[in-house]
Each structure stands twice: as C-alpha cells, then as structure tokens.
Amino acid sequence: MIADGLVVPIALIGIYALLKLVPNDKKYQVYARVLMAGLTAYVAAKIIGVIYQPDQMRPFEVLGVAAGASFLNNPGFPSDHALFTMAITLAVWFGAKDWRLASICLAMTIMVCVGRVIALVHTPLDVVGGLLIACVGIVWYLPMKRPEKSDI
C-alpha cells in the first residue's frame, strides 16, 4: 500500500502548497517553472529509459511471484513513481518555499521508493534513477537573470 498509496497525499500537499502558499504576484513565474521542471524531468526520463535499461524484467518477474504494487508493462527504469513524487517534492521546496511541507513530501517520497522495492516492482537502481532524474528539473528553479535591453 505504501508503494502506491502515498502518491495521492504527496500530490495533494503539492496542490495545496502551490495554490495557497505561493504569493499571487509570483504564481505565473512559479507555475511556469514547475511546469518546465516537470516536463524536463519527464522527457529526460523517457530518453534515458530508451537509451539505458539495466534489466528487461522486473524483480517480481525474475522471482516468479506476484507484484506487490501497480506497475506499467515496461522494464521499470527509471521509476515513474519516484520521478513524479520527487518532482512534486521539489516543486513544494522551490516553488512554495515551504521546507516543512517539502520535508513531509520527501519523507513520503522515500517511503514510496522503499515500498516500490519491497513490492518487487523496482530495483533500488530504478528508484534512485527516478529520484536523480527528477532533480534534472531543478535547473528551472535556479535564479535567472533577465536580459538587459543593451544585451539584445
């Protein structure tokens, strides 16, 4: 249940944080960065998943047992659950700038990742890959200098 069940609370915390904690005058900029960070991480994950696939079978398939959580019919690298939950955690951290909610999201994200491994739907490499690839989107949260008219 942990492997799948905590995704919804993480998403709800993310929605709350981004809707209620981001100042109105910053919403457009924050939402644009969150969108770009998520898209960047997702596209990077799909490209890396096509280029590098450490195993063609998931752990439960190798062991010949039933999966302990939901999964897509693909080899599993990187973990979409890890990618999605970490992307939300980063959005709460950088977008809403609420370290308490981000810490709660991070703890739940780690539980989701451990749960995915315990449920035998991912290897540790799959979930670590998802976590790290989600961090690729951080580039959109870094301060960006607007070009001066003299630079154009």
Model-based region annotation:
Residues 70-152:
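Membrane-embedded catalytic cores of phosphoryl/pyrophosphoryl-handling enzymes
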Residues 1-74, 87-94, 99-107, 112:
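Hydrophobic alpha-helical bundle signature of multipass membrane enzymes
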